[in-house]
Amino acid sequence: MPVGRSLSLDPNLLAQLQSHSPTLWLNPHQGMPLPDFAPTAADLADADARLRRCAGLLAELFAELRPSGGLIASPLQPAEPLKRAARAGHAQAGAWYVKRDDALPVAGSIKARGGFHEVLALAESIAERHGLAGADTDRRALASGAARARFARHTVMVGSTGNLGLSIGMLASALGFRTVAHMSADAKAWKKARLRTRGVEVVEHAGDYAKAVDAGRRQAAGMPCCHFVDDEGSRMLFLGYATAAAELAAQLAQAGRPVDARHPLFVHLPCGVGGAPGGIVYGLKALYGEHVHAFVAEPTASPCVLVQLAGDAAHPRSVYDIGLDNRTEADGLAVAQASPLAAALLRAQAAGAFTVDDRQLFAHLLDARERLGIDLEPSAAAAFGGPAWIAGSDAGRAYLRGRGIDPDAATHVIWATGGSLVPAQEHRRFQAHARAQRQVGGAGA
């Protein structure tokens, strides 16, 4: 049986994916009922409240967070220069913005939202269990000597391609936890070095993301007082990402961009295992319902969420099942199999997915530098082609027509997910590579 035949994928879609051709896929399941395990409104409110009551603690632990009072928040940057540079005139509709999670302090990526939330939830739970904090206790008490001594008896463990490990490692070690990060072969050397300077134990693996996560999960299962941050199934991570929705809503209101039937919101999100985009989409759907249209962006070598959503929902599927190799410069998105939690929720809520090859990643990275003055890592540039896919492709235009959407009335938010902590020499290498490829032919849209 040919590779991929048993996955219930449309043959044309399968052929496009196997040829590494950048593709826009529209989700026919959008609008289906949410699964029974979907988070509740109370869950979302609890996560937001946790981050707010712990803001003072974060500001005390990290000087970089003092200007925001300890809140995890990033700017919303207008992207008109990027819009004007779009290749096709018909792709220049609507208002474009970039959500700058690449600039999030301390962790330098979108993973600060979910990672910090999970570590804070763990710290609160331990402190309350041992009488170190109550419901009304100032959370700065979690940085006390007594709290640190208690946390030092516990281990926090995570499996990561890089950015989640940074997020978990930075906060857990700052609170006094013993911290272990299992890192895949895709993880960049500078990320591992940064963790080690913070006292985090880094365990390097020759295999991919899934193998690093599995190794961490198995080690944690045999250890007392060990909390494993499971990127493939953590509700705490998911809810932390979901809190970004209210932040974005306030920024759009301040920018004078309504979100309603006449003024739809399109959000374009880089996607690895699916937790971060899944959480953000879930939060936005809770606020805006059908008026938000979310598209996830994945490497052509690693479209794990697209494969899961387009195939049989009953069984987990891997990009290896369709003959792809999961090898990409987008290290943060080099994931072969989607999170079951995120995939089930995205199946009901995502508008679709599109894929981007490495040449396009570097072209978008260079556009971000030259048009907007933003230095990104390759994975963070994955979603920059989203607006052009919607307004400039046959499938995208069909999506707009089918919903009676006026492209000029839409707001497009492109999520930039990481880059501010990348060493300067790495940024120079990225940009030199992008300029070299542009000289020999550039990249497609």
UniProtKB/Swiss-Prot annotation:
Positions carrying N6-(pyridoxal phosphate)lysine: K111
EC number: 4.3.1.18
Pfam families the UniProt entry points to: PALP
Reactions mediated catalytically: D-serine = pyruvate + NH4(+)
Cofactor(s) needed for function: pyridoxal 5'-phosphate
Domain of life: Bacteria
GO BP term, example: D-serine catabolic process
Signal peptide range in chain numbering: none
Gene Ontology molecular functions: D-serine ammonia-lyase activity; hydro-lyase activity; pyridoxal phosphate binding
Enzyme class: lyase
Alphabetic keyword roster: Lyase, Pyridoxal phosphate
Homology family: Belongs to the serine/threonine dehydratase family. DsdA subfamily.
PANTHER family: D-SERINE DEHYDRATASE, THREONINE DEHYDRATASE, MITOCHONDRIAL-RELATED
Name used for this protein in its record: Probable D-serine dehydratase
Lineage of the organism: Bacteria, Pseudomonadati, Pseudomonadota, Betaproteobacteria, Burkholderiales
